[in-house]
A protein has these predicted regions:
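Residue-level recognition of tetratricopeptide repeat
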Residues: 13, 47, 84, 117, ...
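Position-specific recognition of the canonical hydrophobic site in helix A of tetratricopeptide repeat
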Residues: 16, 50, 87, 120, ...
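TPR alpha-solenoid repeat register
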Residues: 41, 75-78, 111-112, 145, ...
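TPR/TPR-like (Sel1-like) alpha-helical repeat modules
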Residues: 67, 172-175, 186-212
């Protein structure tokens, strides 16, 4: 791996921090074509591919680099990214199996966040409740885990009162969290406060949507259009 290849990878990472995602992806692709082997940057590129719904490309890249030497936290990130890909490609059970194996090896916030959300998506009510409760005990300031538990109560148990407790905790920690804003806007609408609902939805629109968001950009825009 040459000096220019490393420079392109570092430049790509810098572009991400400045919000230039297209520029970052272009530089990462050039660096990979030139033989980039730094796992940190390859994982970063896989995340960009996933966020742009290029799941097949991300999966292919992750399979390629899984044999590379890497730190344990990077390997965990690789498996989480891979599970996200196969989930979005229609292989929910495979994604769950991968993440459950990772959780058995060691507890981590990243796995709690991702597996907890997938349990909700899979309508695994008992597992979702137990796991997301455990996740919030593991880290009661993880806004994603709090949102996962809130969604468990809201979507699977139809307990909106209990759900709101955790949505409120999540939004207090991360004010711009897309899914939390989306669900809290529904409480505003039920209370007849359209202005508050609109404010939350418009704030959600400014966020960076992920394939692991329940609320898509289209869903948020449609809700705003109804107001």
């Amino acid at each position: 791996m040459g000096i220019m290849t490393s420079f392109k990878a570092r430049s790509a990472a810098a572009k991400i921090s400045k919000g230039d995602i297209d520029g970052a992806m272009k530089l990462y692709k050039e660096a990979i074509d030139e033989g980039l082997t730094d796992v940190r940057y390859l994982l970063s590129y896989s995340v960009l591919l996933i966020r742009n719904s290029r799941f097949g490309e991300a999966r292919e890249l992750l399979v390629k680099i899984q044999k590379y030497p890497m730190a344990e936290d990077n390997r965990r990130q690789l498996f989480v990214n891979y599970a996200s890909c196969v989930y979005k490609m229609g292989e929910m059970q495979k994604a769950l199996d991968i993440l459950e194996r990772q959780h058995q090896k060691a507890a981590s916030g990243l796995v709690y966040e991702t597996l907890g959300y997938l349990y909700v998506e899979a309508n695994e009510t008992e597992k979702a409740l137990a796991f997301n409760t455990e996740a919030c005990e593991y880290d009661d300031e993880d806004s994603i885990c709090l949102d996962n538990l809130a969604q468990t109560y809201y979507r699977l148990l139809n307990d909106k009162t209990k759900a709101k407790v955790y949505f409120d905790k999540a939004i207090a920690i991360k004010a711009g969290q897309i899914d939390t804003l989306y669900f809290l806007s529904k409480y505003d609408l039920e209370a007849g406060d359209q202005a508050a609902a609109r404010a939350k939805l418009e704030k959600a629109l400014t966020g960076r949507f992920s394939p692991l968001n329940y609320a898509t950009k289209d869903m948020v825009e449609q809700e705003i259009a109804k107001l």
